Amino acid sequence: MILFMIVYISVSKAYSWKKIRLKKYPIIGWLAVIIFQGGYTFLLVSMACENNFTISWFTLQKIEGMLLSTMLIGAYYPLTQIYQHNEDSQRGDFTISYRLGIKGTFIFSAIMFLISFVIAYCYFNKYFDSFQFYIFGLCLIPAILYFLYWFIKTIKDIREANFTHTMRMTFLSSTCLLIGFLILFYLNHMLKSV
């Protein structure tokens, strides 16, 4: 587990450390973030919960879970950079959000979210049931509505692509995901033990 953590910390440092600064490369930086904050984090948490750090952990279900986690982070992460394009460009950091532009970032994120939802639908149907997917989707409705509201506001006034909206989106989507996962945990574990 320590080795896995060292790898995670090393990539995180490489993302913003002046001598390497993966952040200045749009695709490489984005891939580093989404893989390590998405699929790799899924791997670490799942391995730790199961106390299984062997090759036997890598089942198709777990790999597909890693893919879903990576795609969700891939959809969301560019939105966290949307308000800092000027600051990033002054440092020479040409992030994926900077390259896409503000409107392009919203469109890119929307497409990635749609792909993520298709993957989630397939994942839940394959390993659980569609009812659980619908619970997951319902819990995300407030975040989806806020995303659309923020996008419309930003189209009308580019200054709406700011820190405040980014943090609101972060808080709302995190809260919605947490509630969704708690409900799914309850359905899958607590009800079965009753």
Where are these regions (language model features)?
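Membrane-interface helix termini and inter-helical loops of multi-pass transporters
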Residues: C49-F58, N125, K192-V194
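Membrane-embedded alpha-helical segments that form the functional core of polytopic membrane enzymes
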Residues: M1-K13, S56-L79
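Intramembrane alpha-helical segments
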Residues: M1-F53
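Solvent-exposed interhelical
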Residues: T70-F117
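Juxtamembrane boundary at the C-terminal end of a transmembrane helix
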Residues: L182-V194
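Alpha-helical transmembrane segments of integral membrane proteins
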Residues: L3-F4, I28, A32-V33, L60-L68, ...
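Small-residue-rich segments of transmembrane alpha-helices in multi-pass membrane proteins
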Residues: W30-S46, Y98-I102, T164-I179
